[in-house]
Regions:
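N-terminal nucleotide-binding beta1-loop-alpha1 segment
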Residues: 1-19, 193, 220-228
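Conserved alpha/beta core of the MobA/IspD/sugar-nucleotide pyrophosphorylase nucleotidyltransferase superfamily
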Residues: 3, 155-222
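Conserved beta-loop-beta/alpha segment of the NTase-like Rossmann-fold superfamily
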Residues: 60-137
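Glycine-rich phosphate-binding loop of ATP-grasp-fold ATP-dependent ligases
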Residues: 82-83, 130-134, 319-345, 366-369, ...
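Conserved core of the sugar-phosphate nucleotidyltransferase
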Residues: 107-182
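Phosphate-binding site of ATP-dependent enzymes
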Residues: 153, 334-397, 408
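C-terminal active-site "lid" helix and adjoining low-complexity regulatory extension at the edge
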Residues: 220-222, 395, 399, 408-444
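Conserved N-proximal alpha/beta basic substrate-recognition cap immediately N-terminal to
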Residues: 229-318, 326-327
Length: 444
């Protein structure tokens, strides 16, 4: 099998952001981008790997030559576009189909192996590009259109299976003055080629400094669990039981799990690449530490703080007098049936050193607890109107794992009276743990 890599670009955006290494030699998880591709191609049975590099960064060619890989063929060419770089490879590609990718395309190896068996053009629903090439497909999975404007179900993943007849179309495009790969792809459709799309969950490009951390996180099999302080659990073990259940499921999926508490979390624990951090932390110092974490944190510190700021209500009695961050004691939430009880509850909290207090409206009706993880898990699932209102609130606060309490009045009106980050999911812990583990892996 023949593979080809376009590695002749300048990487100007990365250079502008202070990255000195040429793009092919940028390391993801300790491995150069070009080395990673070559290793994967060889493991997939490559008998020829053709790479085009430019003359402006001779260290790339020198690095490739140092690999002493007999399957590797190097072309040096300074080209104005990716189409011209592909054309420079044409003389050494031979007369067989080949798989083409750019040097900065990052994917999971298992996804790539399935692509080789089943697809022609890799596509992904994951959009993280400034100017993605949107793709429409038909019911059989064949590409019907390449579009500059979305949305469409997929965007191009930058991995293509091409044939010698397709290279003739490339030559025609260049002779017409075309320079962009997306126009070459459109020309293939216009020429009647049937291009079978292969969806891959996520494919990343390294265009900016921040993309390096994204790629390392994407490929990492390490997940850190941060347990909530007993200060915020009211002495109950439910929170720890939930996070432990999530950790067991992730271990079964071959993730390496490490654990700490919000009191013992250190910056050093966040230095290695992490697929994500599942954090129940609420301590302000811990949230400040996590705010500087380069890896995905679920829930984000900003969202946790948003959840803590429940409201600025000052409702008259009858009402609920609440501590306006996190309840640590039963007396942090008090029902006041009249104004005297309301004032007494406020004064009692102030006497305990609590200054941030809200008085929340009391609503008559049926109280319901609800739980959510992302957009795909919600309990109780028999209340679609509550689900929509809860999802809207979660989006406003930026929460990914959430829950709370609502009152449903006799007229059907829904009032959300409490909304929290990382509830215990006590009534549905096992199924919630599966949903949270899925969200941790896929972050959707």
């Amino acid at each position: 099998m023949t593979f080809a890599v376009l590695a002749a670009g300048e990487g100007s955006r990365l250079e502008h952001e202070g990255i000195r290494e040429p793009k092919p030699l940028i390391r993801i998880g300790g491995e150069c981008l070009i080395d990673r591709l070559i290793r994967i191609f060889l493991s997939c049975g490559a008998d020829k790997i053709c790479v085009v590099v430019n003359s402006r960064r001779p260290e790339v060619k020198a690095h490739l030559e140092s690999l002493r890989c007999p399957e590797l063929h190097i072309v040096v060419a300074d080209t104005p576009s990716s189409m011209h770089s592909l054309r420079a490879l044409a003389p050494i590609l031979g007369d067989k189909p080949f798989v083409l990718t750019t040097v900065d395309t990052v994917f999971r190896e298992e996804d790539f192996r399935r692509y080789l068996r089943e697809g022609d053009f890799a596509v992904t629903p994951w959009v993280d590009d400034e100017k993605p090439l949107w793709i429409d497909t038909d019911g059989g999975g064949f590409i019907t259109a390449f579009r500059d404007e979305g949305p469409c179900p997929y965007v191009s993943g930058g991995i293509y299976r091409l044939t010698p007849p397709m290279m003739q179309v490339l030559e025609q495009c260049i002779r017409r003055g075309e320079a962009r790969m997306r126009n070459f792809q459109r020309a293939l459709l216009a020429a009647g080629f049937r291009l079978r799309a292969f969806p891959m969950e996520r494919i990343l490009d390294i265009d900016h400094r921040s993309d390096i951390a994204k790629a390392e996180s994407f490929l990492s099999r390490d997940i850190l669990l941060v347990h909530r302080s007993m200060r915020y659990t009211k002495g109950r073990p439910d929170d720890r039981l939930l996070l432990n259940a999530v950790g067991r499921i992730l271990q079964e999926e071959d993730f390496r799990i490490s654990e700490t508490s919000e009191e013992t979390l250190t910056a050093e624990m966040l230095h290695r690449p992490l697929h994500c951090v599942l954090s129940m932390a609420r301590n302000p110092e811990t949230l400040a530490l996590l705010a500087n974490c380069p890896w995905p944190v679920v829930n984000t510190p900003r969202a946790v703080l948003n959840a803590a700021r429940r409201s600025d209500e000052d409702a008259p009695a009858p009402c609920w007098v609440k501590r306006n961050d996190y309840a640590e004691h039963p007396s942090d939430v008090v029902f006041a049936p009249n104004e005297a009880a309301r004032q007494q509850a406020v004064e009692a909290m102030r006497a305990r050193g609590i200054s941030d207090i809200v008085c929340q409206h009391h609503h008559e009706g049926r109280e319901v607890k609800f739980y959510g993880a992302g957009r795909n898990f919600f309990r109780p699932d028999a209340l679609p109107a509550l689900r929509e209102k809860a999802l809207e609130t979660a989006a406003e606060k930026g929460l990914e794992i959430w829950g709370g309490d609502a009152v449903i009045g006799a007229d059907g009106d829904i009032h959300i009276i409490d909304f929290n980050d990382w509830p215990s999911f006590s009534s549905c812990r096992e199924e919630a743990a599966k949903a949270i583990a899925h969200y941790a892996v896929h972050q959707k």
